[in-house]
Structure formats: C-alpha cells, structure tokens
UniProtKB/Swiss-Prot annotation:
Primary localization: virion
GO biological process, one term: symbiont entry into host cell
Modification Phosphoserine, positions: S79, S95, S97
Post-translational modification: Phosphorylated on several residues by host. These phosphorylations regulate VPR activity for the nuclear import of the HIV-1 pre-integration complex.
Domain of life the protein comes from: Viruses
Keyword terms, alphabetized: Activator, AIDS, Apoptosis, Cell cycle, Host G2/M cell cycle arrest by virus, Host nucleus, Host-virus interaction, Ion channel, Ion transport, Modulation of host cell cycle by virus, Phosphoprotein, Transcription, Transcription regulation, Transport, Viral penetration into host nucleus, Virion, Virus entry into host cell
InterPro entries recorded: RetroV_VpR/X (IPR000012)
Gene3D superfamilies assigned to the protein according to its UniProt record, in alphabetical order: 6.10.210.10, VpR/VpX protein, C-terminal domain
Residue numbers spanned by region Homooligomerization: 1-42
Native source organism of the sequence: Human immunodeficiency virus type 1 group O (isolate ANT70) (HIV-1)
Protein known as: Protein Vpr
Amino acid sequence: MEQAPENQGPAKEPFNEWALELLEELKAEAVRHFPRPWLHALGQYIYETYGDTWVGVMAIIRILQQLLFTHYRIGCQHSRIGINPRGRGRRNGSSRS
C-alpha cells in the first residue's frame, strides 16, 4: 500500500504569521500613497464590520492590495507601471522592438 511522503522540506511559515507580515508590508506601502485619515477610516470600517478576526485581516489585505494596484495602474508618480496617455518614452512617433 502506498504511503504519503514524509515531510522532508523546511518547515513552512504558519499562514497567520505570513498574513500579518503581508499586512504590515501593505500598510507601510499604503501610508506612502494615501492620506492617513483615509487609511484610519478603512481600518475602523473593517474593525466594525469584522471585529478582531482573521476574516477582517484577510479583508483589509485584499482591499489594500486592490487600492494599491489601482493607484499604481492609473498613474502613481512613483511607479513605472502606470498608464501614460502621452506615450512617454517615444520619440517622434517611432517605437523600438
């Protein structure tokens, strides 16, 4: 009869530690791009809606990821991935392959 392989790899970081580290990184990035009162209001909304639960942690992670992605995409001046309607980087209409 077949047996499951033994756990031979390095110990994986528990999900909750990973989620809290990710949340801290997202918060640090968000305060560089959004007003603190907005972020405080978002935190209050999440706390009032979900309380102090893992569902709340995952909700705020998802919202911060979406906010930051959208912010970068529509043209954060600190980002290189924004949409630029003026076609920055082109000279005289020529494009390089």
